[in-house]
């Protein structure tokens, strides 16, 4: 009996047939012999294996030693509480800066807050390391994690709250990324920020987003790392090869007019944040073959939030990086043992080899983005009532060429692409505009490629006018 091909097999066949059918008919305008292709980068391969498990462990052990890091805890003691933890992280950044000849500036932006989880006016302070870019210093790539910790009662500021995974793991990763990237060249500015106030209401993310706006930063991406060190799920799954990257589908700052345009022209799954997530997936595929990025089409886990949200609300692209399988007995728990189950966020729940791989993903992503040009702006397409599609964009500084990408409208990742040289448009012959999504990336002379920018406001990496004018 002859078997019937599965739907998946048929889909793969369809894609292969389409690719063979389409490739011979592609004609691009203006590229000649000047096309620049993205290149495999040996320096990124070296970075991928550089994170130190020993460094990560030392940072987490030190943060745990402060007992609790609740935002509401002691700020005066040198041995216990959020104040001591902040000062230690600041000293660690300063030591890294000393080792690179002062290449890193350390700042501590803060604001006073009261709220549902902050009953009395409290200073929320972030500790931020800034490595200025050599070519495009106003363009900024940010890595964040939150320094504060909690137990079952979020208002309990005195009980021990080790917060080894939530989120000393994220802080350890960004400190290690700062150490490694302090020794590397970067055209765009790199920012590594240990935030406070996350557990009380994402206040530290707001402090940093407001600081970025006040400084005139052009934030290309915030990579928010929160709960990234555990490989043992509560459901019994052991998986040290998967990391989740959450990203919003439509921009948080989208206006009614922009939403109306998007509904008819597409862009529901192509915010700049979503294309940052796709970029991270490609980075992992190319440089970290033992780590799979699982893209999740949500801003965050169901009903939950993280410090990427204030960035999104400020109009900046941002994603959340989180372990593949969470264990809720180790999150937001009083330290205790019940019915043979050990509750609490202790260091025993951290897989340091896994944490090193997730740290590498962030480090390589930041390095690659910072060396590539900014994504193209002004991307637009035309081709209604035609069999060809024309893609337009504005040239950007530092780009030696551009690459046009397209994919089936139901495909999660870009499927096809072609280098088109140093031009501002391309005509794709025999590719009907109705059936595909399109985007454009920029490529440097030495082969570093930017994330893909989707056409229109829906996919633009530029901060939206609605966010700029927001009071």
Located regions from the model:
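N-terminal capping segment at the start of a domain
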Residues: 32-80, 330, 338-339
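A non-catalytic alpha/beta surface segment that caps or lines the substrate-entry region
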Residues: 55-132
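Active-site-adjacent mobile loop/cap segments within catalytic or ligand-binding domains
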Residues: 64, 228-246, 295-373
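Alpha-helical metal-binding/catalytic segments enriched in His/Glu/Asp
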Residues: 129, 143-149, 153-202, 362
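Metal-dependent peptidase/peptidase-like ectodomains
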Residues: 195-306, 314, 318
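Conserved aromatic anchor
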Residues: 387-398
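Beta-strand-rich modules
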Residues: 428-449
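Extracellular fibronectin type III
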Residues: 445-471
